[in-house]
Amino acid sequence: AHQLLTASLFRYQAHLFLYLESVGTALAPDGLSPLLDALLCPWPAAVGEALPRRWVAMQPYFYHDIPTTAGDWLRERHSGAQHGRIAVLKPDKWCSYMEYHLKLVSEGLLEGDRWHLISVQENLLFSYLEEPRTHVNIRHQPGVPSAELQEWLAVDPESHFEHFAKEQQGPDAPNFVYLPRCAGTHE
């Protein structure tokens, strides 16, 4: 069984990004909204499958905390407090970016927003964030310095990203675009 904790739908041009958060069995977007599914263009079938897909999963790889129970994870939410953003990796920097971020997660000491999640598909990164931010790390050891963060900062993080046009850029970096939230729970 699963329990849906939150859902948010974000848009960038003709692309939709659906963030689902649950405890228990993972949720799949197919069938959650048949009306929306009917509007989506089909993607080619995955290897080993016969039918085209309406949704393509992104792989989560970077986070600061892991939900264990709904009670542990639930909190007061505010409409408009959920944010989506995208970034595009330069093709020759994909492996480096992934290597450093997987090291940060494995180390578990980098403090960040409890509900921040980054997923990847090809060279596209999608981030989910919430306000107000609640800073934690995976090990739940606040204040312990991250050696992996120092290594990541030493390789010029900004060099890993394509930059968006000035009018698209997020408030904190030229390599992020904040996406409008179209729909979701907690409206």
Which stretches of residues belong to each language-model region?
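Short beta-strand-to-loop capping motifs
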Residues: 19-24, 87-91, 128-133
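Surface-exposed beta-loop interaction hotspot
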Residues: 50-88
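Short beta-strand
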Residues: 7-12, 116-121
